[in-house]
Amino acid sequence: MAKLIPLYQYAGQDLGIMGLGKSGMATARALAGTGTRVHAWDDSPILRDAARAESVPLCDLTDQTSRTSPWPALQGVVWSPGIPHTFPQPHPVAVIAHERGVPLFCDIDLLARARQDCFFLGITGTNGKSTTTALIGHILKAARHPVQVGGNLGTPALSFEPLPFHGTYVLELSSYQLELVPSLCCDVAVLLNITPDHLARHGGMDGYIAAKRQIFRCGPRPGVAVVCIDDEPSLAIHDALCRENGRKVVAVSTRALPRGGVGAVDGQLVDATQGRPRAVADLTTIATLPGAHNWQNAAAAYAACRQHGIDAKIIVEAMASFPGLPHRQELVAEIDGVRFINDSKATNADAADKALRCYDTVYWIAGGQPKEGGIVSLEPHFHRMRQAYLIGQAAPAFERTLKGKVPLSQVGTLTRAVTEAAKAAWRDAIPGAVVLLSPACASWDQFSSFEHRGDIFRELVADLAHTRAAAKPGGRR
């Protein structure tokens, strides 16, 4: 059995756990055997049954009137970030906690309290944070630093194996998590970008920006702030941080080389943090980091790792071997001159914009559970689209935006979209053609997650490749 983060400082205390998904169960496992009195709950009977099977102590936290209610003794509630605690409507357990003055925090906060002897690198942003987090982890591993990578990306914080003294935790931090980490002080904190997303959950754009800014909240020893300044909200945060005493701020941009910062204009990575600008790498040669958005991710990762003490040569060599992440402009296959790109992680228009910029002849598969703002912002890329194939709940709204500007089909399902897009691309036989799944929508209307959506796309493309090969003279049937 893997070792878990030691949480013995909670021995003898009562802690609630609200939400028994991946992070909640990891918390329950980490607290087991520490002498902490755990009171766990989830609204889902299925998740409660799974927790019960692991002997997790269950208690209905929505009931504060029972004689056995733990509320009078609770020191805090470890909160699953996906459960609303303020907007649009706070969960009843959050209301009770607020009325009783019981603090809410997430699993990452427990990690931060338990491992004050380690370094923390935190990454947030509307888009690009998973790639940047994985890239930083890849670089630190190449530099032979003891490191664990996770948070919002993959591994829950309390599923990490304990690192040695001065090891480094590299954490992807969502806006939901950043509202619940009062103890986290990042030694290097990275903000990539801010565009409208999750607005209902944060009560509007101001609340969303405020949540993102929490990554720079710290105690008397502020860490280094790495801020990409290519959007107005991020630039405003950068300027405010520069006015703080004792705070080192490194600006990053793909539009121009910031004074004393790091630039990636046209994919040319340049470091001016030591004064005189120095060319570092040509990012356009790294196939797993295509496009200006990935150059921003790479520049931010470079800046963060340099501030963490990693040599520039090691960083650049590690970037060249970065394998990339699935569902982020992932080349699934090239079949008879047509590339099939899985960008299922593009769950909003800004993310889809980043992918569309990279290709000139696009058969675009889009739609799903719509996000606020739709796809009006993508009009500068409509000329790249040979045809749009619309799926899911957003299809009618997307059709209204595209009609008369882009040839389109409301196909309903991903299966039909892939089939029809492939047929059209092969028929047209235009060099450089791409069938691009970049939905600009969440996936939950038809899939369990963006990963599920991307996996189905992969399977459909594999079926196409098999069928196409079998149909050729001499092909296997």
UniProtKB/Swiss-Prot annotation:
Its main location: cytoplasm. The gene is murD. ATP binds at G125, T126, N127, G128, K129, S130, T131. PANTHER family: UDP-N-ACETYLMURAMOYLALANINE--D-GLUTAMATE LIGASE (PTHR43692:SF1). Keywords: ATP-binding, Cell cycle, Cell division, Cell shape, Cell wall biogenesis/degradation, Cytoplasm, Ligase, Nucleotide-binding, Peptidoglycan synthesis. It comes from the Bacteria. Cell wall formation. Catalyzes the addition of glutamate to the nucleotide precursor UDP-N-acetylmuramoyl-L-alanine (UMA). Pathway: Cell wall biogenesis; peptidoglycan biosynthesis. This is UDP-N-acetylmuramoylalanine--D-glutamate ligase. The lineage of its organism: Bacteria, Pseudomonadati, Pseudomonadota, Alphaproteobacteria, Rhodospirillales. It is found in: Cytoplasm. InterPro entries: Mur-like_cat_sf (IPR036565), Mur_ligase_C_dom_sf (IPR036615), Mur_ligase_cen (IPR013221), MurD (IPR005762). It catalyses: UDP-N-acetyl-alpha-D-muramoyl-L-alanine + D-glutamate + ATP = UDP-N-acetyl-alpha-D-muramoyl-L-alanyl-D-glutamate + ADP + phosphate + H(+). GO terms for biological process: cell division; cell wall organization; peptidoglycan biosynthetic process; regulation of cell shape. Its EC number is 6.3.2.9. Pfam families: Mur_ligase_M (PF08245). Belongs to the MurCDEF family. NCBIfam families: murD (TIGR01087). One of its GO terms (molecular function) is ATP binding. GO terms for cellular component: cytoplasm.
